[in-house]
UniProtKB/Swiss-Prot annotation:
Function: May play a role in responses to biotic and abiotic stresses.
Protein's UniProt name: Probable protein phosphatase 2C BIPP2C1
Induction: By salicylic acid (SA), benzothiadiazole (BTH), hydrogen peroxide, abscisic acid (ABA), wounding, salt, cold and osmotic stresses.
SMART domains assigned to the protein according to its UniProt record, in alphabetical order: PP2C_SIG, PP2Cc
Gene3D superfamilies: PPM-type phosphatase domain
Region (Disordered): 166-212, 251-279
PROSITE patterns: PPM_2 (PS51746)
Family classification: Belongs to the PP2C family.
Phylogenetic classification of the source organism: Eukaryota, Viridiplantae, Streptophyta, Embryophyta, Tracheophyta
Catalytic activity, as annotated: O-phospho-L-seryl-[protein] + H2O = L-seryl-[protein] + phosphate; O-phospho-L-threonyl-[protein] + H2O = L-threonyl-[protein] + phosphate
Swiss-Prot/TrEMBL keywords: Hydrolase, Magnesium, Manganese, Metal-binding, Protein phosphatase
Amino acid sequence: MDEEARAAGCSPAPPRAPAASCGAAAELCLCSPTGVEGIEQVPGCPCFEDAGAVVVSGEAPEGPGVLCSGDGAELKLAEQGALDVRLGSPAVGIHEQQLLHRGTSGSDEAGAINEISPVEVSPSEASSNLDTAGAIGGSPLMLESLPETSDTRGCEQEVMPGVVVGSSNRDASSEVGVESECGSDADGRNGLGEGELVSSVDGGGAEKSSKVTGVLSEEGVDGMETALEPCVASVGSITQVEEGVDRMETSLDDSEASDGSTTQDFDTDVETESSGSSIEEQDMGYGVHIPHTEQAICEVARGNKSSEVKSSDRMSSVTLPTLILASGAAMLPHPSKVLTGGEDAYFIACDGWFGVADGVGQWSFEGINAGLYARELMDGCKKAVMESQGAPEMRTEEVLAKAADEARSPGSSTVLVAHFDGQVLHACNIGDSGFLVIRNGEIYQKSKPMTYGFNFPLQIEKGDDPFKLVQKYTIDLQEGDAIVTATDGLFDNVYEEEIAAVISKSLEAGLKPSEIAEFLVARAKEVGRSATCRSPFSDAALAVGYLGYSGGKLDDVTVVVSVVRKSEV
């Protein structure tokens, strides 16, 4: 796509208020207008009648849901038609001067930087250590200072020589959460009702325990509330979180039922299909929904594997444990993209397959739904996996290539496709979506962002050959390992060490993958809305010369959490 065409129609965003020093933690709450029948005001939470806000949990009446801080700053900034950088105003070209020396220019619509002059800074000036505190479910997360690192997300790390793909990246997604324990697949393209499906397959029969729950009630929201200081960024040891994790688990288990979710059972083949929530239930521009969830546990090995061991004149067989992958996902949209369905997508299919994609928002300036191409990629991957069952196993890059060949919509996207074969994780990646493998509370392996430069990721566009673009990974996994796969909406706002700590504490508390994904998505959204906190994105901006930038990057967020478990079959 011609870069001048991409920049057409873009106007600078209104200047943002200068970054303030981090003060006392602002209590986050879900506001509702006074006088609305059946909705209780949250104690100590300022509400704004003129914003038309309603509670976004339980049986909400109608109108936009608003997640506000104690001083209501987000509401004051969230004026129709006057979006600042916190709300993702298209400001293509702001960093163009910064990228000229690389021979190209690009910007991320959701994270464009405005009113900041590029200057040269040393790496030591690019980041500062802050002592911060956060919470899971209201309990404090005591975070130490984050050591400086040269592996800052958003900075140029992987450049494919001779490749020019698409346009610069990013915006929104439809609000979804999916986690399933199933014998088939789950698809996160549209909004879901919260549910849980567990199926164990033995021979020709299937035993199913199904429970459909709903949007988090006010009690559930209180349990999920992240009373985090606006300036949460540096990461170290995390303490006093067990109680908070327990509260979050209880809140999720006590959720009320919602519509929009359909579950179908077919003997040994169980498929979960969910439709999107209605317009009345969605954010009308600036609110935040707690993601809905559904779960799928997929058995990737149908029996015990054996390894032959030779010893002089005899041969014996050593039985290896059968491992399965339990995966769950959650999504939240960029507030300005809810009504168009968002631009993130993902899929979870049985036999250990999953993936995420992040459509490039710049296509919307040409009248194209930027999320269609990403959704077609994920649909195509799921279709290829389902059609190949019983045939020789396909490689991840082959699945992606088949999906890309069948995609019909114009567009471009970052994409990651992964498969766990019972012992080894195989993954292929294009762009700045990525994964972390967490073992015993530590980051064991991770992918590298593939970018042309700051905030300008590599992308696959319709007609491109994925084999020339992908970066491939093979990682041996063991029982208890966790995989966090996500679009850059997570990694730009939440430090990797914090993600690892959340995974560790959540698994100790027995939370499901979808519940962990929910918390990570809500955490990323919270940091993305802050104009003052330190984040991986602000670190990257400072590192390339945007002196004075602070805060997160408001974006659509998609997270898939997968846990390696021993099969009970």
